[in-house]
Every structure is written in C-alpha cells, then in structure tokens.
A protein has these predicted regions:
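Conserved beta-strand termini and adjacent loop/short-helix elements that scaffold enzyme active sites
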Residues: 25-27, 96-98, 115
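C-terminal interaction surface of TIR/SEFIR-family domains
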Residues: 103-140
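Nucleic-acid nuclease catalytic cores
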Residues: 89-103
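Conserved N-terminal substructure of TIR/SEFIR domains
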Residues: 1-49, 87, 138-140
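TIR-domain catalytic/interaction hotspot
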Residues: 27-78, 83-86
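Short acidic/His/Gly/Ser-rich catalytic and metal-binding motifs that mark active-site loops
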Residues: 8, 57-63, 103-106
Length: 140
C-alpha cells in the first residue's frame, strides 16, 4: 500500500468482513527487520495478497518532456507487488487500483481490480479469493 490510509482501512475492513485476518505491514512489529524482511516473513504465513495502487507519486519517462506526469503508485508498492507474485504465484495476488493510476505495462496476466466507490471491487476480490481456495463469509 501507499499513503492512502482510507483505502487501506476500507480494504482491511472488507477482508475482516469475509472472515479473514488482514496483515498490514506497518501495523506489525518490526523486530529490527527492514520492510522487505517483514514482507518475506509475512509472505511465508499467507496464501494470498492484496496490493493497493493509489495515487501517491507522479512520473513520466525522462524523454517525455511534453507529456504531463501521470499518477503512480509508490515505487516500493510496484516492487512489493512483483515480489509477492513471485513468492505466492501470480494467481494469489490481486492489485486494487484506486483512480486513474499508471500501472506497470510489461507484466502480463496481472489481475488489476478498480477500487471503485460503489464497492463492486469487493465482489471481484471475493471471486479471486475463492479461486485461490478461500471460504468466505457472505458480505452483502
């Protein structure tokens, strides 16, 4: 996740509502671990990950001087997304995208779900969780 605390809390409450326990890294004790060490540690304990792409940075190619910078997720989020796909398998990672965010375009087969205000994302995430073998409580 990036710095959008509202989105992070909304997703965490949904995860709880379907009977699962969310792990939000910055809420866990560091125990002297770096962020990547915390991800390594907790990735060993989970079978599925949700990654939040929120508008926390702006960017464009160095030679794209006539192009306005696009909203992007923080670089660490993109890195952590890739790490989790490698660790858990691509089918066990779902990226939630809030707003018009530039996403990595060279990763094929990645599931991106729009984190929409109406909440349709919840149905999509539930489908992904069920496809990964999770039994969920009804959330409607």
């Amino acid at each position: 996740h990036g710095r959008d605390n509202e989105a992070k809390q909304e997703v965490a409450r949904f995860v709880e509502s379907v009977g699962l326990t969310p792990i939000i890294l910055h809420e866990q004790a560091s125990g002297g671990k770096t962020i990547i060490e915390k991800i390594e540690h907790y990735a060993d304990e989970v079978g599925f990950a949700l990654v939040l792409y929120t508008a926390c940075d702006h960017g464009r190619g160095i030679h794209e001087t006539k192009v306005h910078p696009k909203q992007r997720a923080r670089q660490n989020v993109v890195f952590e997304h890739g790490y989790l796909m490698a660790k858990l398998d691509r089918g066990n990672v779902c990226a939630l995208v809030k707003g018009e965010i530039e996403t990595p375009n060279d990763i094929s087969g990645v599931v991106y779900v729009a984190l929409d205000a109406a909440g349709a994302w919840k149905t999509e995430v539930a489908k992904e969780l069920k496809a990964s073998g999770y039994s969920l409580k009804e959330f409607f």
